[in-house]
């Protein structure tokens, strides 16, 4: 299969260390680096860079995406998404156009809207995140309660989630809202307000600074 892809305009840097199932589709002008595994019903668009050291299983990737040293399972990437190094997308992860997921970020059963930035050390599970929101380092959605139930987190557009924020689901953060570093959010945060503390409380609006 690597040789067949190369005949279709795909660049494979090291065919001997690249593993591609017969069922995989890859668009022209995509580059696949060494030690990459493309498995199952994976479909990759045009002008992407995959690897090195990446595993994609049953994953759909749009055009001009970058996946570096990461594992993607049953996920969807729209166009111009960048992941890695050491990112992990699990079943049901959907990253919209222009999303960036950096090192040691994990997403499961969640939608990240266009332009969302999630730079480092975060877990987003069972969540919906609006466009252009920034997820600070160490942010965690606490989605699994003591009764074994999975609960959802909803974050609006252009919100700013401070580093080390714990979002105890079910909870909602409104459009343009801000959470301070180290906050434990147990109650919903209204749009364009600032919340911080343990537990987090609203201390004013964004306009008030």
Label the predicted regions.
Residues 67-209:
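Glycine-rich hexapeptide-repeat left-handed beta-helix
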Residues 1-69, 77-85:
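Extended, small-residue-rich solenoid/repeat segments and analogous flexible loops
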């Amino acid at each position: 299969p690597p040789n067949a892809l190369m005949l279709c305009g795909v660049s494979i840097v090291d065919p001997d260390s690249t593993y591609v199932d017969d069922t995989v589709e890859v668009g022209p002008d995509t580059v696949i680096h060494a030690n990459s595994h493309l498995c199952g019903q994976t479909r990759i668009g045009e002008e992407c860079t995959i690897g090195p050291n990446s595993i994609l299983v049953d994953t759909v990737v749009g055009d001009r995406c970058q996946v570096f040293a990461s594992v993607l399972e049953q996920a969807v990437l729209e166009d111009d998404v960048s992941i890695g190094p050491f990112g992990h997308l699990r079943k049901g992860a959907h990253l919209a156009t222009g999303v960036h997921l950096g090192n040691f970020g994990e997403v499961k059963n969640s939608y990240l809207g266009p332009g969302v930035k999630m730079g480092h050390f975060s877990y987003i599970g069972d969540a919906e995140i609006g466009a252009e929101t920034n997820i600070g380092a160490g942010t965690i959605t606490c989605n699994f309660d003591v009764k074994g139930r999975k609960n959802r987190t909803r974050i609006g557009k252009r919100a700013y989630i401070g580093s080390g924020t714990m979002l105890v689901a079910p909870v909602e953060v409104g459009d343009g809202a801000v959470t301070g570093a180290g906050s434990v959010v147990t109650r919903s945060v209204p749009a364009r307000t600032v919340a911080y503390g343990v537990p987090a409380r609203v201390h004013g609006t964004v306009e008030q600074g």
